[in-house]
Design a protein with these regions (language model features):
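Residue-level signature of the cytosolic catalytic core of signaling kinases
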Residues: 42-46, 62, 78, 112, ...
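Generic hydrophobic, amphipathic alpha-helix propensity
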Residues: 25-29, 33, 97
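Helix-turn-helix
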Residues: 1-20, 24
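Hydrophobic alpha-helical connector segments
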Residues: 24, 28, 38-64, 116-123
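C-terminal peripheral helix-coil segments that are non-catalytic and often amphipathic
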Residues: 51-52, 56-59, 95, 99-107, ...
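Short secondary-structure transition hinges
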Residues: 58-98, 109
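A short, mixed-charge helix-start or loop-turn motif at secondary-structure junctions
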Residues: 15, 39, 79-83, 109-112, ...
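All-alpha amphipathic helical-bundle segments outside canonical DNA-binding/catalytic cores
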Residues: 48, 85-90, 106-122, 142-145
Length: 159
């Protein structure tokens, strides 16, 4: 509550508790994907689109989400018995990934021996790995630069 800069009354008016606030970060990430989706050409190489989405999302996270808040989001997701927004496949994040990966398979740009849902899960896992490591290291390096170097290797197996 103190970190949010609001009174207890205002905080609990908008959020049921700390978990709800932290969960809202996942939907902030969805807003970024909603902003990016119209910029993606139907003709674009789907692997390159996946790299683009990752680069843009992680740049936004690095520039606008406090690493301690992100760390709390991840720790809450590990211990909560309630909703887990990071795994909610109804989110824009998962829907857009599914759409891009499906198109990539149809165009033979991505492998076809894995299911779309398995590939989406793998992509999300790789992205979380980058974010989790950045949180573990308390943001001591540029997340976007690290992703630029490592993410192509991580998801290269989807081709």
């Amino acid at each position: 509550i103190e970190e949010s800069g609001t009174s207890k009354g205002s905080f609990y008016h908008y959020f049921e508790g700390k978990d709800a606030l932290l969960g809202s970060l996942a939907y902030m990430m969805d807003e970024k994907y909603e902003e990016l989706e119209p910029t993606i050409s139907e003709d674009a190489d789907c692997y390159e689109v996946l790299l683009y989405l990752n680069r843009e999302l992680l740049t936004m996270i690095e520039e606008s989400i406090n690493v301690e808040l992100l760390t709390r989001l991840y720790s809450t997701q590990l211990t909560t018995h309630g909703e887990r927004p990071l795994l909610d496949h109804g989110r824009t994040y998962y829907k857009l990934l599914k759409k891009i990966i499906s198109r990539g398979r149809e165009k033979k740009e991505l492998r076809t021996d894995m299911s779309v849902s398995e590939m989406v899960r793998y992509y999300a896992m790789c992205e979380r790995a980058l974010l989790y490591e950045w949180c573990l290291r308390k943001g001591e390096y540029s997340l976007s630069e690290e992703a630029e170097r490592k993410f192509p290797m991580m998801i290269g197996s989807l081709k």
